[in-house]
């Protein structure tokens, strides 16, 4: 009676192993023979089935290796079936291809993290979109990681692509200056207003400069405007400058200003611009075979004299400033671009009290500075007392007017007899305090209160 009870599980195991092929059936037959031998001896033996993965015997109910029985009834070594599941990525029986559902557990009921299958998470629509392709799903989905599409990141360089104007240009030989223009255009026209261009200056060593070179620093914050005057030395023989390649400057705060264009000056070769245009303003850098010279929008002209003067060119100055000295010899008057003194008289008086300046006499700086014959009581320096970074020292001709529209307090000056004075800037480095003003000389000196309007 006990032998018959032993045969039934053995034959059942043989049928279960039949899905694995002939080897399983042979193992079932062998199991039956062993059972017959056990019947003769009267001892029970454990059923043995082969593992279709490693082809080793799977001892049911004991043995050195852990076993796993799937829902379909097939038994495998635990490490073998685990490797098969990991290789396929799905809990599928290698024999009957049936998909298992549930979680793998050890015999003691513990559930290790390495035995967790993503098949449980693959059918959970809470963690990913139903339209998401299968190739994008990974083991990170159970942890609710969101995949960032690379398509949008690849479009980032298009924001910085140049649509209409040239790439940023750097001019390395502005007689001691390094002018760089950078811009941030928008990728789609009309989507957003164009952003401002960024322009800055860096000092460079120049061997062709005959006078001290200086650098500008401009700060723009909303309606606040601040400039350091930047003189750019030019040719000394009166030759006109080479062709200027314009660089666009966009700024939304200046769209209310009138339009103007640069007018070449046959006397000193400076392209002066007295107002900032409505649409992109153009500041020129130029190319030449022998040497490179450049000019920015000029506010103050150069006085006429027997020798050619080095142009003093501040960048992007306010529209209402007028040059001083002999106007007829400094630039060519144009009614469409340059504005006469009576047209700017109201604007100067309206903002006259917004900024304070103090004038003090010039101190001699050596042979490399401006002409020594210009030094003395006829020349003063302007120093800003504003809350922003100070303006550099600028010599101002006491014989001529600071503004072209204000009446002269010292009478009419003969510019043909005395050379006109030039405005000259002084570089103030970062972290250094401005030099103290020198005491005024005893002869022909006074302090004057000046006002520079602020935009």
From Swiss-Prot:
A zinc finger (RING-type) spans 51-97. SMART domains: RING (SM00184). Residues 15-33 have a biased composition (Gly residues). Residues 1-42, 286-311, 426-455 are annotated as: Disordered. PROSITE patterns: ZF_RING_2 (PS50089). Its EC number is 2.3.2.27. Keywords: Metal-binding, Nucleus, Transferase, Ubl conjugation pathway, Zinc, Zinc-finger. It is found in: Nucleus. One of its GO terms (molecular function) is zinc ion binding. Interacts with SPL14/IPA1. Functions as an E3 ligase that promotes polyubiquitination of SPL14/IPA1 for subsequent proteasomal degradation. Regulates plant architecture by modulating SPL14/IPA1 abundance. Promotes the degradation of SPL14/IPA1 in panicles, while it stabilizes SPL14/IPA1 in shoot apices. Ubiquitinates the SPL14/IPA1-mediated complex with 'Lys-48'-linked polyubiquitin in panicles and 'Lys-63'-linked polyubiquitin chains in the shoot apex. This is E3 ubiquitin-protein ligase IPI1. It comes from Oryza sativa subsp. japonica (Rice).
């Amino acid at each position: 009676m006990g032998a018959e009870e032993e045969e039934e599980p053995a034959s059942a195991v043989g049928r279960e192993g039949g899905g694995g092929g002939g080897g399983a059936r042979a193992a079932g037959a062998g199991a039956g023979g062993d059972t017959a031998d056990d019947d003769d001896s009267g001892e029970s033996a454990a059923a043995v089935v082969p593992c279709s993965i490693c082809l080793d015997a799977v001892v049911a109910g004991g043995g050195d290796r852990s076993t796993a029985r799937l829902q379909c009834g097939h038994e495998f070594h635990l490490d073998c079936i685990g490797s098969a599941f990991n290789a396929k990525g799905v809990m599928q029986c290698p024999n009957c291809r049936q998909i298992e559902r549930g979680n793998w557990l050890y015999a003691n009921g513990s559930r290790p993290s390495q035995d967790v299958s993503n098949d449980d998470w693959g059918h959970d629509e809470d963690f990913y979109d139903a339209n998401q392709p299968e190739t994008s799903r990974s083991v990170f989905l159970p942890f609710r990681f969101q995949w960032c599409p690379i398509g949008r990141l690849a479009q980032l360089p298009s924001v910085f692509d140049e649509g209409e104007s040239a790439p940023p240009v750097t001019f390395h030989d502005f007689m001691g200056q390094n002018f760089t223009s950078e811009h941030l255009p928008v990728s789609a026209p009309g989507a957003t207003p164009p952003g401002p261009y960024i322009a800055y200056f860096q000092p460079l060593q120049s061997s062709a400069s005959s006078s001290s070179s200086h650098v500008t620093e401009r700060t723009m914050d909303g309606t606040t405007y601040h400039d350091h005057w930047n003189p750019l030395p030019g040719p000394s023989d009166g030759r006109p400058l080479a062709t200027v390649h314009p660089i666009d400057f966009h700024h939304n705060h200046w769209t209310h200003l009138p339009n103007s264009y640069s007018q070449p000056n046959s006397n000193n070769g400076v392209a002066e611009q007295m107002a900032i245009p409505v649409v992109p303003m153009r500041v020129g850098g130029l190319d030449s075979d022998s040497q490179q010279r450049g000019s920015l929008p000029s506010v103050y002209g150069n006085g006429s004299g027997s020798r050619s003067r080095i142009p003093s060119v501040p960048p992007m100055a306010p529209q209402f400033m007028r040059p001083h000295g002999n106007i007829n010899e400094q630039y060519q008057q144009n009614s469409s671009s340059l504005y006469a003194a009576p047209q700017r008289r109201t604007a100067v008086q309206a903002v006259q009290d917004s900024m304070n300046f103090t004038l003090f006499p010039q101190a001699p700086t050596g042979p490399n500075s401006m002409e020594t014959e210009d030094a003395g009581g006829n020349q003063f320096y302007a120093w800003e007392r504003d809350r922003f970074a100070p303006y550099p020292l600028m010599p101002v001709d006491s014989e001529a007017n600071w503004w072209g529209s204000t009446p002269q307090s010292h009478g009419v000056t003969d510019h043909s007899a005395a050379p006109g004075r030039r405005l000259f800037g002084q570089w103030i480095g970062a972290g250094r305090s401005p030099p103290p003003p020198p005491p005024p000389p005893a002869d022909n000196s006074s302090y004057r209160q000046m006002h520079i309007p602020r935009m």
